[in-house]
Amino acid sequence: TILPIDFDAITLNAGVNNGKATLQWLISIAGNGDIKGNVHVADLEKKRQLSGTVDIDNLTLDLIKPFLGKGEIAEGRVGAQLRLGGNAQSPLLFGQFGINQLKVVGHWIPFDITKGNVDVQFNGATSDLSGRIETPEGYLNLTGNADWRKLDAWHAVIAANGNKLRVALPPMVRIDVNPDLVFEARPHLLKLDGRIDIPWARIVVQDLPESAVSASSDEVMLDKNLQPIAPKETSIPIQSNLAINIGDDVTLDAFGLKARLTGALKVNQNKQGLGLNGQIDIPKGEFKAYGQDLQVRKGQILFSGPVDQPYLNIEAIRNPENTANNVIAGVRVTGLADKPKVEIFSEPAFTQQEALSYLLRGEGLDKSGDADSSQMTAMLIGLGVGQSGQLV
């Protein structure tokens, strides 16, 4: 495949003379900018002193346009004036690198950027980052710093603070986030701490993607010799401590459930794995089940550790206006999500057959005989009500 970028010039020179290594380059892009620089390493046998420069002049993101799809945009100007110093054991970098007049629209990023700039100032063995990204609905501010005075103990910190950052994950999720996050990196540890507020979200699930169907918890992978394959460990441990607040304008439309969600969660990750604690409430909702439009009277999803094992405590009732004798009839779902217990209930309390009759028909069993009772009993058995299973 031919690279869809035209070059006015590409030059590269390298050599070693009198114990000194030199590398020089020039890349001149047609109708765009230049990337040029040189690096020198003196006293190769001992001190390995570093010197050189890197310059990026008038470079724009037009060079990636050939790789964009229809309707996608990538605009911005990249510039750098950098100077290299120090030695191989303690490299120093001075100068400035920046991306300005940034505008990006594309399916490969979670949000559109209407205006943005990111600048990094290098101060020898430290650097400072600042930036601001504006989106159609909000913004994201970036600050950070890095320190490599000790190469084996370098560290970098980036803080992100934003408001109404509209994140789209087509076709199912549109969500506004107000992040207040701090990301820290060290040679042997990555950390993410902070808070994410979600004031608004629209989550619509038509079909469950194949990727969302997880493997069995007792699945064992085998190699070609039919021996168990040990799970791979991440090269750098990850720690996270996040507070997630779900606001008052978050709705879910999935598998017959239309509901408003609120709640607060704590996400923790360490070498033991990912943990989730907190509660999601369903203050209002409708659920289609058993051919009925049920109203969610109580809805709680509780997390206490494992992400994939929330505890359900949900009650959905038939519309009381369409139920005879002022009876409340509904479905109660309790227990762990992978093995919930489903019960038919009524207020006042009736037999399961009578309660199911009120739930499905809005009236009690015919007093005259056993036919209706037998039919309801058969339906209860068929539905598995009162048993643990994957009914919901």
Regions found by a protein language model. Give the residues of each.
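Strand-loop-strand
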Residues: 3-31, 77-80, 102-104, 109-371
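Short acidic, glycine/proline-rich loop/turn micro-motifs
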Residues: 63-68
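Long beta-sheet-rich domains in secretory-pathway and surface-associated proteins
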Residues: 56-58
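Glycine- and small hydrophobic-rich membrane-insertion segments that are intrinsically disordered
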Residues: 360-392
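Short flexible loop/turn segments that cap and initiate beta-strands
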Residues: 91-97
